[in-house]
């Protein structure tokens, strides 16, 4: 099928031959259920709207309210702009997803590729929470301000229903696992009108989790977003992978040790390094923990460095039952983010 996915190829054949994609036919050919309304609507789309050389899945989940019910398999969503701006990196990622039969789709109406940050956060019960998306790091730069996606519009055009919150919070700063959520303390400076206790209490109720706050780097020049997903990741509720403490600032080391003790966590060191220069001040190259985790698959960024093997081995040991794939994602990474940043994973 080349670069085309099953859905795209099937619907293209239907369009050319005036075939009605009935639910039974869709199931027989594509391999899973797709409503006749969805199939018929997609059949009317032009070849350009189906991206010609990219797969656009059309599996719509029933959303009577703001909860996805009855779905445990996860789907990876990406901004359409990822394929437009970084086709090679996007196709490398798609190739890995297709290899492991991971469903994926592209989000319409976005203004940048960092969909993790502006899309709703899904709780473990399945609810979508749409936080306010107005990060301070986009302010003061006209190009960046104009790249801020209108979250309400993105949800509308992609038929996503979410509960709204007035808390200013990026999705990349929320890590959820088994009743716990890790966020960086950048949440407090992003919401100056709320007290720390108010924020933690409200977030706990919205996310249905115990809230754990970790320190972000003080310097915005070194970490302009302050997102938790660039510092740590959950293995399970009592174990986290994190940037190697011995290579980090003392105040970060002290904070992590305090958090480890307070919440009875095991901390597994992962190597990291920085390659920022005058041309790429926001580069995320060197951050292995910003991997993509979906279903039974983990896609780890590698950078052509000796640290690659060590990082991959550590992550594989932490997730012995997961399949580990690696990817060169550098053309995206130099812009300030990696795999978790450019994907939105929901079930």
Identify what each model region corresponds to.
Residues 2-14, 21-37, 43-46:
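Amphipathic alpha-helical segments in structured regions that serve as interaction surfaces
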Residues 17-19, 316:
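Generic N-terminal simple sequence motifs
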Residues 20-21, 194:
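Short coil/turn linker and secondary-structure boundary residues
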Residues 49-347:
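The feature marks the mature, well-folded catalytic cores of soluble enzymes
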């Amino acid at each position: 099928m080349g670069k085309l996915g099953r859905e795209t190829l099937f619907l293209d054949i239907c369009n050319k031959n005036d075939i009605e994609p009935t639910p039974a036919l869709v199931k027989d050919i594509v391999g899973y259920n797709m409503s006749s309304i969805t199939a018929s609507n997609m059949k009317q789309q032009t070849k350009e709207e189906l991206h010609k050389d990219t797969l656009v899945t059309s599996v719509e989940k029933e959303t009577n309210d703001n909860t996805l019910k009855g779905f445990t398999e996860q789907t990876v969503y990406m901004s359409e702009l990822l394929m437009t701006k970084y086709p090679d990196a996007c196709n490398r990622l798609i190739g890995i997803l297709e290899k492991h039969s991971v469903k994926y789709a592209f989000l319409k109406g976005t203004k940048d590729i960092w969909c993790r940050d502006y899309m709703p956060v899904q709780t473990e019960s399945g609810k979508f929470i749409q936080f306010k998306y107005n990060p301070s790091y986009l302010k003061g730069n006209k190009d960046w301000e104009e790249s801020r996606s209108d979250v309400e519009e993105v949800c509308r055009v992609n038929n996503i229903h979410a509960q709204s919150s007035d808390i200013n919070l990026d999705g990349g700063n929320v890590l959820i696992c088994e009743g716990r959520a890790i966020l960086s303390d950048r949440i407090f400076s992003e919401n100056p009108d709320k007290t720390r206790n108010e924020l933690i209490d409200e977030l706990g109720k919205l996310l249905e989790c115990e809230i754990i706050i970790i320190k972000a780097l003080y310097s915005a020049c070194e970490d302009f977003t302050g997102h938790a997903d660039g510092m740590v990741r959950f293995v399970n509720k009592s174990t986290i992978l994190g940037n190697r403490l011995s290579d980090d600032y003392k105040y970060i080391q002290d904070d992590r040790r305090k958090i480890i003790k307070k919440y009875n966590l095991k901390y597994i060191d992962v190597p990291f390094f920085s390659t920022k220069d005058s041309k790429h001040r926001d580069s995320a190259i060197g951050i292995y923990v910003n991997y993509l985790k979906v279903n039974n698959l983990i896609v780890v960024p590698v950078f052509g460095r000796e640290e690659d093997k060590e990082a991959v081995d550590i992550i594989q040991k932490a997730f012995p039952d997961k399949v580990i794939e690696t990817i060169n994602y550098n053309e995206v990474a130099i812009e300030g983010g990696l795999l978790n940043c450019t994907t939105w994973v929901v079930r």
